[in-house]
Amino acid sequence: MAPPSFFAQVPQAPPVLVFKLIADFRDDPDPRKVNLGVGAYRTDDSQPWVLPVVRKVEQKIANDHSLNHEYLPILGLAEFRSCASQLVLGDNSPALRENRVGGVQSLGGTGALRIGADFLGRWYNGTDNKNTPVYVSSPTWENHNGVFSAAGFKDIRSYRYWDAEKRGLDLQGFLNDLENAPEFSIFVLHACAHNPTGTDPTEEEWKQIAAVMKRRFLFPFFDSAYQGFASGDLEKDAWAIRYFVSEGFELFCAQSFSKNFGLYNERVGNLTVVGKEHDSVLRVLSQMEKIVRITWSNPPAQGARIVATTLSNPELFKEWKGNVKTMADRILTMRSELRARLEALKTPGTWSHITEQIGMFSFTGLNPKQVEYLVNEKHIYLMPSGRINMCGLTTKNLDYVATSINEAVTKFQ
């Protein structure tokens, strides 16, 4: 008699929520359907957009017969790593001037987070210290919890961030949680365009946050997925990270080029490491090299070449900034148009938070019953939390979406 399958006891895992939402949208035959769940940019025709500068650079790379398909170094394409770190830290960064910055090319922002988490679990504040508390914002991108948990951290906590009543930042709660966190705790911070709320601290609020973190010896691990994409201004979107560096912090920053280059399926990321001196950064990179070797061994070249070529060429860099601003401006327009329509309809509640938030996502404040009504009755797909992707809005569906939200809020207050 044959034994049962070795996998007979494997339970069915629940689907990843955002991808389940996309599948449900795809299978829905209703012509009115609107996808506000997708985590990617869309044009006003609801289509993906390949940036014109990316098309140009892809052709340039294809025509360069000196390039080949040999393995990249374990830590990645050197030009990409340096360009990526320079982009987030700025040309005049004291850390760059003092040669105490390193970079690790990764498989997207998630890969950068994972390499950083694996390193911290092995080497942060001692060796194999996985009992160090890791704090993530409440709410946060769901992968933050999963990545640090998979890296072996046993004490993952949340810090207060979103004030549901005022639909804005809970600064006092945030500061109190910083004050009460054990010294040397790790804090995952969103550099800009907080996901899912779209609500960021002001520069003055960031200064207060940094002051407490400095006094309490807390380690900042920034997640920068939207530089340039949030406000349309590369410098503004990196302000918090640069301020922390100017204050003498050692820190990690996970960078993603999925959104601001539109390179979603190329998986282009970088982990920027800022240390106190050159030698310590070299030692950190030597350990990260070991981690990468047993994780993906060597990163892919195409996306990194596209980013490095663009960032290192002044003309292409200028064109890219224009492309990024095109995306950011469309999102800002959709925010103001949605708010205007809801206010014109006299939809119950206040809607100013829609234009006060920035980036791809808006935390609408819609409750679960309202969301359920929108999905089931109106075929408008959004996350159960009420988070919507502003890129899913177009001049063609704005009226329908606003009217539907008005109905949902009026029916289920």
UniProtKB/Swiss-Prot annotation:
It is an enzyme of class 2 (transferase). Expressed in liver and kidney. L-aspartate binds at G39, W141, N195, R387. One of its GO terms (molecular function) is pyridoxal phosphate binding. CDD domains: AAT_like. It comes from the Eukaryota. GO terms for cellular component: axon terminus; cytoplasm; cytosol. Induction: In liver and kidney, by glucocorticod hormones. Levels in the liver also increase 2-fold on animals fed on a high protein diet or during fasting. By hypoxia during cerebral ischemia. InterPro entries: Aminotransferase_I/II_large, Asp_trans, NHTrfase_class1_PyrdxlP-BS, PyrdxlP-dep_Trfase, PyrdxlP-dep_Trfase_major, PyrdxlP-dep_Trfase_small. SUPFAM superfamilies: PLP-dependent transferases. Pfam families: Aminotran_1_2 (PF00155). The modification Phosphoserine is found at S46, S149. Belongs to the class-I pyridoxal-phosphate-dependent aminotransferase family. Homodimer. In eukaryotes there are cytoplasmic, mitochondrial and chloroplastic isozymes. Biosynthesis of L-glutamate from L-aspartate or L-cysteine. Important regulator of levels of glutamate, the major excitatory neurotransmitter of the vertebrate central nervous system. Acts as a scavenger of glutamate in brain neuroprotection. The aspartate aminotransferase activity is involved in hepatic glucose synthesis during development and in adipocyte glyceroneogenesis. Using L-cysteine as substrate, regulates levels of mercaptopyruvate, an important source of hydrogen sulfide. Mercaptopyruvate is converted into H(2)S via the action of 3-mercaptopyruvate sulfurtransferase (3MST). This is Aspartate aminotransferase, cytoplasmic. The gene is Got1.
